[in-house]
Amino acid sequence: MTETAKRPLYVPHAGPSLLEMPLLNKGSAFSTQERIDFNLQGLLPHNIETIEEQTERAYSQYNLCNTDLDRHIFLRSIQDNNETLFFRLLEEHLEEMLPIIYTPTVGQACQEFSKIYRTHRGLFISYPDRERIDDILRSATKNNVKIVVVTDSERILGLGDQGIGGMGIPIGKLSLYTACGGISPAYTLPVVLDVGTNNPDLLNDPMYMGWRHERVSGAQYEEFVDLFIQAIKRRWPNVLLQFEDFAQTNAMPLLERYKDELCCFNDDIQGTAAVAVGTLLAACKAKGEKLSEQTVTFVGAGSAGCGIAEQVIAAMRLEGLDEAQARRRIFMVDRWGLLTDDMSNLLDFQQRLAQKRADLGAWGGQQGDDLALLEVIRNARPTVLIGVSGQRGLFSEEVIRELHRHCPQPLVMPLSNPTSRVEATPQEILNWTDGQALVATGSPFQPVQVGDRRMPIAQCNNAYIFPGIGLGVIAARATRVTDGMLMAAANALANCSPIVTRGEGAVLPALGDIREVSKRIAVAVAKQAQAEGKALQTSDEVLNEAIEANFWFPRYRAYRRTSF
């Protein structure tokens, strides 16, 4: 516990209003003196409880819920009543509850957002209010916001356009910043940009709570986002802004436009890439190989897949390959087949990853012919197969067996969310590779029984990366998030892998260890920021103290009454 946590907190609120503030409410844990000082006598049951007793009751109530969505709603209700209790409950049951507060359950919560809505959290900034964004940001009661997660809800997980229902994603992401990375909830703010929706189910739903209008696009959309960004810079000039679940056509352009203007990153592109590269590095370390020796096939060439590919290329170059050599080891397969330089329908970021058709002469096929996944596997002979397609079953038995035929121990990463959209299940992959594959998934899966072995499955979850990045940025007061900082995060994650440290187990650490993993990532990120001149230089001792000082624990502090 930090020295700050031991000191009393001076609070100007009292009575029912204090009980209605999730960041300050202790419920039945208010002491006798606090009940007197803050006019709470008679507003709470007589017995004074510890947070341990409150947590035990909350968990017993949680276990009465019948469905995962019910559990999600229950946890969110606690969060909106008492944030300290909410995060204490998560701390004690993180592996069990992480799939409930985030993927995969959060996807259903987004789809049902208007039906299960209970109370306000975060900011809803709609296009008709575009001239009042500064006023909207001023209405936020948190003056010391350090992390904002924003979405326009156009590409929520693998579910597409969810309108304002996408607010569930920033809320869930920021819950993980706190639960996994120790960022105080007082420093976080979820935001949804309501630019309309093209989802007919929402437009025709009488309960839909968002702006009933088709999505704004083009110049109007870009101007609206820029109004928001500039207002954020005025309100919180040192904030870390995370773009979340923007559509492919907007995600990369927004990142490219603003990455040198403020401290920001896109978790779908950069966070996903960092955790994927960390997973690849861990697998290579375990096999005694180099990343630069691998050949990687991607299924899904959207912004996420291409973002991972670019970071893999950057990592290969750090091991000595030149750019052309690294790019020849990357094969991107999308709905048109293998991306090649003779295709006319590729986006800019896809063109950089297209293979030269002239180099594929031995594969067969004429100019313009599609090269399907199986043909790519057969000819490229990859050692790594990564799925970010959102299409269930694309990793067929024939594909996986062909992969294994050329590589005794392939790394297979079906990363699509939610579980219903995964390219193949771990059980299928291990059955088809005689238990030899290394597997990391995007959604959580239970351990798989293969013969007499029970094999844990690593979840290639961005929660391994972004909380540590946030903690490192805040502790070092970094002004930007750079590619070097992301690579430092990936390397730190790889060094925490059980198959690296112990020679057995899953490719990634257990989620129960994620808070310590986040601290290690934070140190690596902060040091890299200092090395690149994006943060003030300090000694290692001062940096470690800053990380510990910024690491929040869900514990109640003593309160003292003060006036406004």
From Swiss-Prot:
It is an enzyme of class 1 (oxidoreductase). GO terms for biological process: malate metabolic process. The active site is at residues 102, 173. InterPro entries: Aminoacid_DH-like_N_sf, Malic_enzyme_CS, Malic_N_dom, Malic_N_dom_sf, Malic_NAD-bd, Malic_OxRdtase, NAD(P)-bd_dom_sf, NAD_malic_enz_proteobac. Divalent metal cations. Prefers magnesium or manganese. The record marks 268 as: Important for activity. Keywords: Metal-binding, NAD, Oxidoreductase. NAD(+) binds at residues 155, 268, 417. The keyword Protein transport does not apply. Gene3D superfamilies: Malic enzyme, N-terminal domain, NAD(P)-binding Rossmann-like Domain. It catalyses: (S)-malate + NAD(+) = pyruvate + CO2 + NADH; oxaloacetate + H(+) = pyruvate + CO2. It comes from the Bacteria. Its cofactor is Mg(2+); Mn(2+). Pfam families: malic, Malic_M. One of its GO terms (cellular component) is cytosol. Its EC number is 1.1.1.38. A divalent metal cation binds at residues 244-245, 268. GO terms for molecular function: malate dehydrogenase (decarboxylating) (NAD+) activity; metal ion binding; NAD binding; oxaloacetate decarboxylase activity. Belongs to the malic enzymes family. Homotetramer. This is NAD-dependent malic enzyme. It comes from Pseudomonas paraeruginosa (strain DSM 24068 / PA7) (Pseudomonas aeruginosa (strain PA7)). The lineage of its organism: Bacteria, Pseudomonadati, Pseudomonadota, Gammaproteobacteria, Pseudomonadales. The gene is maeA.
